[in-house]
């Protein structure tokens, strides 16, 4: 989260530094809220579709060969990829 704020600050200073003083840019960044990814099922499905995974079991979907995933009644396996689960569920780092 700190990296996002620093990136936003640098972008603000770079873009608005010649119009606004740096102190005003820092004040804007300190008041601004960091946007949070949605946690609804729609947003989970959207993120899963963007990386080609099932939003319920985190397997590759559509399956390459015979798979336990039908995208309706599937369940997560014993050890799903934690990075994929974190991305699909929208958990922050």
UniProtKB/Swiss-Prot annotation:
Zn finger region (C4-type): 54-69
Superkingdom assignment: Viruses
User: Coiled-coil segments, which residues?
Assistant: none
Recorded hits in Pfam families, A to Z, give:
Carla_C4 (PF01623)
Q: Which InterPro entries match?
A: Carla-bd
User: Region (Basic) spans which residues?
Assistant: 44-47
* GO MF assignments: DNA binding; zinc ion binding
Q: Which GO terms describe its biological process?
A: regulation of DNA-templated transcription; symbiont-mediated suppression of host innate immune response
Keywords, sorted A to Z: DNA-binding, Host-virus interaction, Inhibition of host innate immune response by virus, Metal-binding, Suppressor of RNA silencing, Viral immunoevasion, Zinc, Zinc-finger
Biological role stated in the UniProt entry: Suppressor of viral-induced RNA silencing. The potential mechanism of action is based on sequestering siRNAs.
Of which family is this protein a member?
A: Belongs to the carlaviruses nucleic acid-binding protein family.
Q: What is this protein called?
A: RNA silencing suppressor
